[in-house]
Amino acid sequence: MLRSMWNFLKRHKKKCIFLGTVLGGVYILGKYGQKKLREIQEREAAEYIAQARRQYHFESNQRTCNMTVLSMLPTLREALMQQLNSESLTALLKNRPSNKLEIWEDLKIISFTRSIVAVYSTCMLVVLLRVQLNIIGGYIYLDNATVGKNGTSILAPPDVQQQYLSSIQHLLGDGLTELVTVIKQAVQRILGSISLKHSLSLLDLEQKLKEIRTLVEQHRSCWNDKDASKSSLCHYMMPDEETPLAAQAYGLSPRDITTIKLLNETRDMLESPDFSTVLNTCLNRGFSRLLDNMAEFFRPTEQDLQHGNSINSLSSVSLPLAKIIPIVNGQIHSVCSETPSHFVQDLLMMEQVKDFAANVYEAFSTPQQLEK
């Protein structure tokens, strides 16, 4: 039996060698394929886990953004009420002063200015914090993912984070003061000549707000002619000049250099067309919500209904400006409310804001950021 098998192998030696080579090759290729498949599966699993981890970190970061906005609204409201103190004027009016008309005129300008500034500054706060916290969130994610690997140092240590995020004070300080000045001038120009006895409908109010917005948003547009995509409102959120830290160009510490880098990246983001579009969308939603809040006071009376006025018409009910002033004056408590109001919730939950935040986080949480 063995001799016949041996003779068979000798007679078909080349065929057997060829067959053995083929079978061996198939075996080796099979093993190699299994190894590669295992590597691909492991890599895909690692990428999936990393993506899931990054998605979880992003969603957690957005919740932090929302809570931070709500926590800062009382500070914003207090700053506004301090700069535009209408309460002192209403207190004076209760004493029936001889210059009552003059006080009413002042109250008209301050009330409208305060509510309009509240809308602008709240929208700016929402979008600016989205940018800042997603930039720093991206850095923190990279720190958590890479620290200690290959001698990688921390990109954004806690002291840098604190120093960077403190730049929001510009919006709550000098930026807000300048915004108040510009809006007050616009309100004076549009509403200053309108008599307190003159009646306005909700549609009239909407038109006046549009005219005021046009003046405010064109105030610095001539400065931006070279870059039409840049928002004219950036100046109120970050100063045009380099940050005060840049004045320390001699002997900057590594921490200061990192902070300046973060601030410059933020400035670039604020000057982008996407930021301008998102902020403008927020402002449109904000002023629409402001009018919705005031619409409650423009409901037709029984007498209006008897005369056949349309309930749904924005121009069916008109109120004297003197009666509209208290309505406008109280809007700050709805706009700058730290308890989730319809106004703030609308801004925080806008899809455009969410998408923009995701793009910012994506840009600053990728490994390529380490190479910059």
Swiss-Prot record:
Q: Does the keyword Lipoprotein apply?
A: no
- Show the segment(s) annotated as Interaction with PEX19: 120-136
Function field: Involved in peroxisome biosynthesis and integrity. Assembles membrane vesicles before the matrix proteins are translocated. As a docking factor for PEX19, is necessary for the import of peroxisomal membrane proteins in the peroxisomes.
Q: Where is the protein situated, by its record's location annotation?
A: Peroxisome membrane
User: Which key words are in the record?
Assistant: Membrane, Peroxisome, Peroxisome biogenesis, Transmembrane, Transmembrane helix
For this protein, the parts annotated as crossing the membrane are: 16-36, 117-140
Q: By its UniProt entry, which Pfam families does this protein fall under?
A: Peroxin-3
**Top-level taxonomic group:** Eukaryota
Subunit structure comment from the entry: Interacts with PEX19.
List the source organism.
Rattus norvegicus
**Ranges in the Peroxisomal compartment?**
37-116
Keyword Chloroplast (UniProt): no
Predominant location of this chain?
membrane
Entry protein name: Peroxisomal biogenesis factor 3
**Similarity section:** Belongs to the peroxin-3 family.
Q: Which residues lie on this side of the membrane: Cytoplasmic?
A: 1-15, 141-372
An example GO CC term for this entry is:
peroxisomal membrane
Matching entries from InterPro entries are given as:
Peroxin-3 (IPR006966)
Looking at the record, which segments are called Targeting to peroxisomes?
Answer: 1-45
Gene designation: Pex3
GO biological process: any one? peroxisome membrane biogenesis
Extract the GO molecular function terms from the UniProt entry. lipid binding; protein-macromolecule adaptor activity
Q: How does it sit in the membrane?
A: Multi-pass membrane protein
